[in-house]
């Protein structure tokens, strides 16, 4: 099965009327997951997978995708600050290639630069303890990533319905 990575704007026609998206924040030790609502307007933190073996990680991710009728995955692409691709981008692309062999669902990349930093800053502002931040930062970062993609999808949909110059 070939890797099916699409630009976000090409995803819209493939989505069923009430299908959801899963957002993924891929780390070396954990995988943060978030879930859209059925109208694809709001991203909610879902869970954090402690990485063990790829097969177990993929099994859990795909089980959640089946459980929530997920149409596609939005995975954070960890670009360098200058926009270039580094080793973490290669690791993310390898993960997507491996996972795409197990599912027919498409993938979309979303620039995740500073997502974890933004979430951590918000948690610190809320006076969350270091332990609490560690427990939730990955799934919150996944929600941050997915919300950005959902907002973009909504904008594309709104502007497509208008006559723009």
From Swiss-Prot:
The keyword Coiled coil does not apply. One of its GO terms (molecular function) is nuclease activity. Its EC number is 3.1.-.-. It comes from the Bacteria. GO terms for cellular component: cytosol. SMART domains: YqgFc (SM00732). It is found in: Cytoplasm. GO terms for biological process: rRNA 5'-end processing. Could be a nuclease involved in processing of the 5'-end of pre-16S rRNA. Belongs to the YqgF nuclease family. This is Putative pre-16S rRNA nuclease. It comes from Beijerinckia indica subsp. indica (strain ATCC 9039 / DSM 1715 / NCIMB 8712).
């Amino acid at each position: 099965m070939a890797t099916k990575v699409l630009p976000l704007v090409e995803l819209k026609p493939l989505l069923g009327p009430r299908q959801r998206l899963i957002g993924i924040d891929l780390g070396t030790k954990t995988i943060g997951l978030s879930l859209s609502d059925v109208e694809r307007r709001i991203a909610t933190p879902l869970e954090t997978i402690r990485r063990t073996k790829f097969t177990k990680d993929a099994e859990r991710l795909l089980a959640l995708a089946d459980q929530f009728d997920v149409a596609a995955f939005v995975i954070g692409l960890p670009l360098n600050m200058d926009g270039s691709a580094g080793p973490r981008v290669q690791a993310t692309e390898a993960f997507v290639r491996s996972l795409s062999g197990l599912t027919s669902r498409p993938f979309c990349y979303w620039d995740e630069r500073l997502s974890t930093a933004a979430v951590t800053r918000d948690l610190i502002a809320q006076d969350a303890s270091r332990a609490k931040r560690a427990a939730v930062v990955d799934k919150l970062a996944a929600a941050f990533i997915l919300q950005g993609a959902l907002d973009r999808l909504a904008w594309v949909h709104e502007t497509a319905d208008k006559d723009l110059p």
